[in-house]
């Protein structure tokens, strides 16, 4: 498995925190079962802890053109630390209706992989057209 991400836990797993979660992932990595350890969160404090820990290779966090300065700083910090950033809620959880504007915003961040949440083939066609005709 390329990436194993802890998903939206109420804390940031770390070695010796008593949960055994991070140790289990290190063991899986040592055994070649996973290549990278990541984390997802909806909470800024947990995302910040994950980056500060130096333990995670990816961070999945809400990010869109509705984002604020502290979230932009997360993206910049990920780039500096060479941590992959996966943007969940790239369409603002349904608040953004202009997919072209959302795509143009994301195109400004070469270290961000957006998760578009495509539900229909027509939506997929829209995003493919933006890629083919920037």
Q: Could you say what each language-model-derived stretch is?
A:
Residues 1-5:
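Active-site gating/metal-coordination segments in enzymes
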Residues 8-134:
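Beta/alpha (TIM)-barrel catalytic core signal, keyed to glycine-rich beta->alpha loops juxtaposed to Asp/Glu
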């Amino acid at each position: 498995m390329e990436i194993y991400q802890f998903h939206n836990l109420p804390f940031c797993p770390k070695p010796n925190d008593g949960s055994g979660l991070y140790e289990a992932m290190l063991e899986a990595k040592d055994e070649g079962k996973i290549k990278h350890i990541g984390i997802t969160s909806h909470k800024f404090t947990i995302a910040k802890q994950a980056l500060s820990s130096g333990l995670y290779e990816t961070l999945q966090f809400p990010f869109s053109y509705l984002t604020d300065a502290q979230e932009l700083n997360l993206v910049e910090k990920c780039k500096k630390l060479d941590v992959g950033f996966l943007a969940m809620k790239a369409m603002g959880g349904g608040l953004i209706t202009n997919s072209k504007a959302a795509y143009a915003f994301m195109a400004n961040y070469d270290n961000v992989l957006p998760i578009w949440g495509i539900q229909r083939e027509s939506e997929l066609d829209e995003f493919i057209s933006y890629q083919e005709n920037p």
